[in-house]
Amino acid sequence: MKAIILAGGHSVRFGKPKAFAEVNGETFYSRVIKTLESTNMFNEIIISTNAQLATQFKYPNVVIDDENHNDKGPLAGIYTIMKQHPEEELFFVVSVDTPMITGKAVSTLYQFLVSHLIENHLDVAAFKEDGRFIPTIAFYSPNALGAITKALHSDNYSFKNIYHELSTDYLDVRDVDAPSYWYKNINYQHDLDALIQKL
């Protein structure tokens, strides 16, 4: 099982690449890597990013998005890594701007997936908040690759586009025993300031 850290966004709203923003002296990407490593669930943790940022990561396992799908958002990152690892059975996807994700959240979602896998033949297990799914904290089966490829060849690169074609189930973020901010995206500097005040 592989983990994909999505870190290829332009971070326009934040003002600088979010992967290198810091919480308590630790970069977002380092923090997410450490959390994923702590679960002992993954045979490989891969950072998915763009050519401009790739050399800035102090981490050996960085993959640049497929050149045919540059600037097509997070689906391009998932697509690129799935194509490179056709034998892999499952991929966990997390956005780099979710620095407070916990190992407990990852393992809880995995247990949810496994418990529903056989009965429901799930392609995707994701979290949801107030009925809205969070596609960038989710497990994806390789079966999702077809729908992702189709979306990338259309003009609609949104996750909603692929979720309609896949067997998907959701776990509520409140089902995880963790601080309420564990799943929050940091989109703006004031989001980071607010998070730091809570810590």
Curated annotation (Swiss-Prot):
InterPro entries xref list: MobA-like_NTP_Trfase, Molybde_CF_guanTrfase, Nucleotide-diphossugar_trans
UniProt main location, coarse: cytoplasm
EC number: 2.7.7.77
Reactions performed catalytically: Mo-molybdopterin + GTP + H(+) = Mo-molybdopterin guanine dinucleotide + diphosphate
Binding site for Mg(2+): D97
Cellular component GO terms, alphabetical: cytoplasm
GO MF: GTP binding; metal ion binding; molybdenum cofactor guanylyltransferase activity
Comment text on domains: The N-terminal domain determines nucleotide recognition and specific binding, while the C-terminal domain determines the specific binding to the target protein.
First-level EC class: transferase
Organism, as annotated: Staphylococcus aureus (strain JH9)
Entry protein name: Probable molybdenum cofactor guanylyltransferase
Cofactor: Mg(2+)
Key word Transferase present: yes
Organism taxonomic ancestry: Bacteria, Bacillati, Bacillota, Bacilli, Bacillales
Top-level lineage group: Bacteria
PANTHER family: MOLYBDENUM COFACTOR GUANYLYLTRANSFERASE (PTHR19136:SF81)
Protein role: Transfers a GMP moiety from GTP to Mo-molybdopterin (Mo-MPT) cofactor (Moco or molybdenum cofactor) to form Mo-molybdopterin guanine dinucleotide (Mo-MGD) cofactor.
Gene responsible for this protein: mobA
Subcellular location field: Cytoplasm
